[in-house]
């Protein structure tokens, strides 16, 4: 029986989970539309979740909330977490840095002073991109030669950033190649070309950036 996901009809916290599942597992998703608040709250405490929230993930008797816990569970099922304490710690390090990368944009995206904060964010962005470029190096993926959940976390963060600054990867060809490599994975390519793929919004509908009903007038590269 396919696992079940539940989340709003946004990319938000769920998108890396969707990408990971599209890469290697069948699932069904309960999408909650913008005006489905009452629908969600009527079901919230009826799903058997220990800490009810969105996103949620139900795989037989395993019922989880919190996007990182969901990602780690799925990744662990597919041997992506590492087999030694050192490998697992390194994966955790990449996870934390990927969360920081996405939350850095999220923090300013919901702030009423977004336009003011954006200037400082963009000023620091090249340093952040260089850090990730140096970390990736000549490897095709962040853990070396095989795809893992952290690749989808970083892909999604970088893709969101490209909507704010379409040229952010111009000086980092290995990151450009990394993004193209993820997009070219057969199952990911098929998903992105399907009507199930959510292109927008990146964040909640009320966000100053990444919300609303349509992306910025400029398109990311």
Curated annotation (Swiss-Prot):
Its EC number is 2.5.1.18. It is an enzyme of class 2 (transferase). GO terms for molecular function: glutathione transferase activity; identical protein binding. Residues 84-202 form the GST C-terminal domain. It catalyses: RX + glutathione = an S-substituted glutathione + a halide anion + H(+). Keywords: Transferase. InterPro entries: Glutathione-S-Trfase_C-like, Glutathione-S-Trfase_C_sf, Glutathione_S-Trfase, Glutathione_S-Trfase_N, GST_C, GST_mu, GST_superfamily, Thioredoxin-like_sf. Conjugation of reduced glutathione to a wide number of exogenous and endogenous hydrophobic electrophiles. This is Glutathione S-transferase class-mu 26 kDa isozyme 1. It comes from Fasciola hepatica (Liver fluke).
